Design a protein with these regions (language model features):
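A glycine-rich helix N-cap at a beta->alpha junction
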Residues: 79-92
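Conserved phosphate/ATP/ADP-binding segment of small-molecule kinases
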Residues: 152-233
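Glycine-rich phosphate/adenosyl-contacting loop at the front of the ribokinase-like
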Residues: 1-63, 68-72, 78-79, 240
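Conserved phosphate-binding/catalytic loop of the ribokinase/pfkB sugar-kinase fold
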Residues: 89-90, 100-137, 142
Length: 302
């Protein structure tokens, strides 16, 4: 494949999301929606959109079907100036979709999703490694595992930083963890992967993987990273969230984007926390993702 140089390349899960804001999340009952939205989703997919919003050139690599959800996934990427040149469209297959229910009072949500019936990328013939080799950063979410592992090897061989959003324990995840330059995990992942409930111990165990940067996101409690053997903690910004969908996805991107500019890890966390907070002010994983100018203004005022 011919490829132009792209700053930020994502590989992983992409879906079509159906989001609804509800007064409460019902069980065995009905409730009227207060607001609803359809837009593209997926951890690495939303993360890659965030890179484009923050001013980097971006591309995504994954599979979709040629059905209506698949076509919408591609349109949403293109509307966000994320290149789809390396996307694989499988004819006659069903694309991933997700249903998200968001509780109005808290912004917390429940998600039900399906990967459709798509075969994963074949790294031998369906991954644009030239695109990856010319990037500044490769973003992985643990999906498309075989392709992600091969892509990480190519990235590291060409000095491209690997940013791994470790949110879920999946087959092959331990191999991916050991290929990451930036390894920031969710609380749940950190506890399960390290087999300890003490996050202050877990972060040191994560560092044993060899990543340059290890961190843990903790939602409203902020985030932490390890810096030369010292734990740095950054509080989350106080906001009234509308929807927390995608908050972690954009945090990982924002941390990586800032890390390309400075290795001041506290500054990277603060920048990422600002992007995540601003995202949560609007419905949808992508609607509220800020531009760089909006982030800079927010930080000047906080």
């Amino acid at each position: 494949m011919s490829s132009n140089a792209i700053d930020y390349v994502g590989i992983g899960f992409c879906s079509n999301d159906y989001l609804s804001v509800l007064p409460h999340i019902p069980y065995d009952s009905k409730v009227q929606m207060l607001e609803h939205l359809i837009q593209g989703g997926g951890p690495a997919a939303t993360a890659t959109v965030a890179a484009a919003r923050l001013g980097l050139s971006a591309a995504f690599i994954s599979t979709v079907g040629d059905d209506d959800p698949g076509k919408r996934i591609l349109r949403d990427f293109e509307a966000e100036h994320v290149s789809t040149q390396a996307m694989i469209v499988r004819k006659g297959f069903v694309s991933p979709i997700a249903y998200c229910w968001i509780e109005q009072a808290t912004g917390k949500r429940c998600v039900a999703w399906t990967r459709g019936n798509l075969a994963e990328l074949d790294p031998a013939k369906e991954v644009d490694f030239d695109l990856i080799s010319k990037a500044k950063m490769l973003h992985l979410d643990g999906h498309q595992t075989a392709a992600a592992l091969a892509a990480a090897d190519v990235a590291r061989a060409h000095g491209v930083l690997v940013n791994f959003d470790a949110g879920t324990i999946r087959p092959g995840v331990e191999q991916l963890v050991r290929k990451a330059d930036i390894l920031i995990t969710s609380e749940e992942f950190a506890r399960r992967f390290t087999e300890t409930d003490d996050l202050s111990q877990a972060i040191f165990k994560l560092a044993e993987t060899g990543a340059r940067v290890c961190g843990i996101t903790m939602g409203e409690q902020g985030s932490m990273v390890l810096d030369n053997g010292n734990i740095l903690r950054c509080p989350a910004f106080t906001i009234k969230p509308v929807d927390t969908t995608g908050a972690g996805d954009v945090y990982h991107t924002a941390f990586g984007v800032r890390y390309l500019e400075t290795h001041d890890l506290m500054e990277c966390m603060r920048f990422a926390s600002a992007v995540s907070a601003l995202k949560c002010l609007k419905l949808g994983g992508r609607t509220g993702i800020p531009t760089r100018a909006q982030v800079d203004e927010f930080l000047r005022n906080h």
